[in-house]
Amino acid sequence: MEPYFPIFISLSGKKAVVVGAGAIACRRVKSLLPFGAEITVIAPEVCGELELLAREGRIRLERRPYAPGDLTGVVLAVSAANDRAVNHRAFLEAKAAGVPISVADCKEESTFYFPGIAREGEVVAGVTASGADHKLAKEAAAAVRECLRNFVESRESHGKTDHPGREPGKRPGSSPDETGAESN
């Protein structure tokens, strides 16, 4: 398998749809939230974490099955339903509309992979093993995360900062526990 090209896109204020509301869908939503996407989750049953995010106004929740047309106007889609047929229908709609989609149960239908994410302030790194080894990608992302922390701390300890006025040790956007865990 050839490696995927890493690309970083702005999701700020743009619509993203997540089909499904189980553990994988929840991880995907939590990976997308820090990047400003307007996230709609579509699923008949919803996990507690997503319920809470909806109550806090951080995501929009539609408690119903996925239906044709749900991906209209979105810039990014994730299908992580616990139903192969639903995921396949979402893939077909995304493909027809030219919408990038990650399909949790079928890497062949995914047009992108969720990377392991490492973030410290404005520095963001994504790690993938091209869908071949999720554990390797997760471990590599943890190593990159640690390197970024050390890099930022070293710069700050040497007075190199692009953020005057920020309290030492206060780095907005750091990601101590982002797993993003590469998967479809």
Regions found by a protein language model. Name each.
Residues 118-165, 169-171, 177:
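Adenosine-phosphate binding glycine-rich loop
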